[in-house]
Swiss-Prot record:
Membrane spanning residue stretches: 26-45, 68-88, 122-143, 166-168
Species name: Rattus norvegicus (Rat)
Keywords attached to this entry: Cell membrane, Disulfide bond, G-protein coupled receptor, Membrane, Receptor, Transducer, Transmembrane, Transmembrane helix
Stretches of the chain found on the membrane's Extracellular side: 1-25, 89-121
Name assigned to this protein: Putative gustatory receptor clone PTE03
UniProt xrefs under InterPro entries: GPCR_Rhodpsn (IPR000276), GPCR_Rhodpsn_7TM (IPR017452), Olfact_rcpt (IPR000725)
Length: 168
């Protein structure tokens, strides 16, 4: 939603975005950002299993587990996007306001509201720290275990193979 809007704005020399367009853009950005975080964590777990438990890789990383991790990522991201979207819709705005950018950000919309935004701010900080911190923690834990496993390998050839597995 950002690129088509940007192309229209470049042609019309207009940087404003409508309220409906802003809500739509917010929802898609939150959806895809959340999915990206959780999918990166799933990829880190995949690398962890491939390096630290190579003999059990096919038993652990079955198609069913990959599907569950992907669908869980999608469901959590949809709930997050809907929750923020619905909380933005309950805000009231005193006057007709335009966001002077081609891209609509959650913080900008909350700042433009003339109603109480305490719940929105709490939700933003809670969801951001949870949906950012949990995947980040999983990624850090996975790569910590990978690095410690690689450092315990006796030969440099096996270390090289392990690092090349991480890079692929």
């Amino acid at each position: 939603t950002t690129v088509p809007k940007m192309l229209i704005n470049l042609q019309k020399q207009n940087k404003a975005i409508s309220y409906a367009g802003c809500i739509t853009q917010l929802s898609f950005v939150l959806l895809f950002a959340g999915m990206e975080n959780f999918l990166l964590a799933a990829m880190a777990y995949d690398r962890y299993v491939a390096i630290c438990k190579p003999l059990r890789y096919t038993a652990i990383m079955k198609a069913h587990l990959c599907l569950v991790m992907t669908l869980l990522s999608l469901c959590i991201s949809i709930v997050d996007a809907l929750l923020h979207g619905l909380m933005i819709l309950r805000l009231s705005f005193c006057t007709f306001l335009e966001i002077p950018h081609y891209f609509c950000e959650l913080y900008q919309v909350i700042k433009l509201s003339c109603s109480d935004t305490l719940i929105n701010n709490i939700l933003v900080y809670t969801m951001t720290s949870t949906l950012g911190g949990v995947p980040l923690g999983g990624i850090i834990f996975s790569y910590f275990k990978i690095i410690s496993s690689i450092l315990r390998m006796p030969s440099s050839g096996s270390r090289h193979r392990a690092f090349s597995t991480c890079g692929s």
